[in-house]
Regions:
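Flexible interdomain linker/hinge and immediately adjacent N-terminus
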Residues: 1-39, 169-171
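Basic, Lys/Arg- and aromatic-enriched nucleic-acid-binding interface segment
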Residues: 20-68
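Conserved tyrosine-mediated DNA breakage-rejoining catalytic core shared by Y-recombinases
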Residues: 27-38, 72-141
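A short, glycine-centered helix-capping/turn motif at helix boundaries
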Residues: 49-53, 58-89, 226-228, 237-239
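Short, basic/aromatic-rich helical patch in the C-terminal catalytic core of site-specific tyrosine
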Residues: 56, 70, 212-226, 233-234, ...
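Short, polar N-cap/turn motifs at the start of nucleic acid-interacting alpha helices
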Residues: 79-80, 208-209, 228-249
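Active-site/catalytic core of tyrosine-dependent DNA strand-transfer enzymes
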Residues: 117-207
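Catalytic-site neighborhood detector that most strongly recognizes the C-terminal catalytic loop/helix
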Residues: 237-264, 268
Length: 271
């Protein structure tokens, strides 16, 4: 028998993409992580790993970044000077930094760091996004930077990236590579995302193991279902409307009239 090669790339998260609000569905995983957060005093390492898993998913969901950009995001702690723009451009990396004026954590990434840097989306301008202080995101970032991240490093050389591995005696580096970051994400989904009827744990029945690339599918599909706009969906994943139409067109709501009515009916709801 010949193995079927053309597998549906959306299969692992189809149960999420077919929901009316895919992002609200996927968000259940981050809620599950918070619900099962270990006590940091009794189980410091387990708590640090849970916070890291929470932030991987949350920052991925807020930014729509590709795996490499998320994995290589540098950290500039509060009170420290941000890395020069030139350094970030040369190393093709972004940085998570504290914006004192806005009172928020900001993701700053030069356009050259992106796979599609020549895309009309960027116009040679950097990507800048203030992370919203919603559902304890800022609190968890602060706790991770101050307590959990140093614990995960365990005295190993600091690679400077926001996300670091749990350093073991055999570890040569605290940096994630493409494989280890994918495995960390997949493990998070297996532990918190996939509903297990025997234990009652896990957020979503029917979900399958997957990696960080699927987050972009969730965001694009969510916006497409809510707005019917390829253009708005493209903003969420730093891409073009053509690419979104090509990849996600099948998830566009079939009943366009209902979609338009949903937008218009808001006015009557407000009255």
């Amino acid at each position: 028998r010949v193995a079927r090669v053309h597998r549906d790339p959306f299969e692992p998260i189809l149960v999420v993409l077919e929901a009316e609000r895919p992002l609200a569905e996927y968000r259940k995983i981050t809620d599950e992580i918070l619900r099962r957060m270990p006590d940091a005093r009794r189980h410091p390492k387990a708590a640090a790993e849970a916070v890291r898993a929470f932030l991987m998913l949350r920052i991925g969901l807020h930014t729509g970044l590709r795996q490499r950009n998320l994995r290589e995001l540098m950290l500039c702690a509060r009170g420290a000077a941000p890395r020069p723009e030139r350094w970030l451009e040369q190393h093709r990396r972004g940085e998570l930094r504290w914006d004192e004026r806005a009172g928020a954590w900001e993701v700053y990434i030069p356009s050259v760091a992106f796979k599609n840097s020549g895309s009309s989306f960027f116009g040679k301008r950097p990507f800048r996004l203030h992370l919203p202080d919603l559902s304890s995101l800022q609190e968890q970032i602060d706790a991770y930077v101050e307590r959990h991240r140093p614990l995960l490093l365990g005295g190993c050389g600091d690679p400077g990236t926001f996300f670091v591995k749990s350093v073991k005696a055999t570890s040569r580096t605290a940096s994630y590579d493409q494989t280890t970051f994918y495995e960390a994400w997949r493990l998070t989904i297996q532990r918190y995302g996939i509903f297990n009827p025997y234990t009652g744990r896990g957020a979503i029945p029917g979900l399958l193991p997957h990696g960080p690339h699927n987050v972009r599918d969730v965001l694009a599909t969510h916006i497409l279902k809510q707005t019917g706009s390829y253009e708005q969906a493209s903003y969420a994943i730093q891409d073009t409307p053509d690419m979104v139409a090509q990849h996600y067109g099948r998830f566009l709501p079939q009943d366009k009239a209902t979609l338009a009515a949903k937008v218009l009916n808001v006015v009557w709801d407000e009255a």
